[in-house]
Amino acid sequence: MYRELIEKLIEGHSWAKLQEPCSEKNITNAEKYVGFSFPEELKALLRETNGDRNFLLSAEEIISNTKNNREIFPEFLEAEEFEEKVNRFIFFATNGCGDYYCYRVLANGETDTTAIYIWEHELFEIREVAKDIAELITKYYNNEV
């Protein structure tokens, strides 16, 4: 489903390169590192393509970007604020400018799957941009986000 959608949308865009599917082991490793179970639609996306080397992050990039954010931003925020504004997100795509498309994880540890957000790193703010991954992908490749 996602692979076909992306292939259709990236026609003529040489910068997007769909990768091979992600292994279940790598998805599990990414979930363990991030500390939250991934929503089924994100797992389905990774099972079809492990990123696109531009917008969509691979499982390994999800880990490395989460690691970087956890290392960089604590110096700017108090512990509680860091937990709320940085650590409660599952980042899975990027705009290339340091901001991430993500799911929000609620205080009870459950993932909010009703929306996809953009996490703006300079302000530590989020804004809803899509209702699901398919809508986000469509908007991104049509230059609507």
Residue ranges and their predicted role:
Residues 1-101, 144:
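A surface-exposed partner-binding patch
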Residues 102-130:
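Segments surrounding the PLD/"HKD" phosphodiesterase catalytic module and close analogs
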Residues 52-56, 60, 107-110, 119, ...:
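Generic alpha-helical propensity signal that fires on short helical segments
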Residues 98-101, 115, 138-139:
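Intrinsically disordered, low-complexity segments enriched in small/polar residues
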Residues 125-135, 139-142:
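Compact, glycine/acidic-enriched structural inserts
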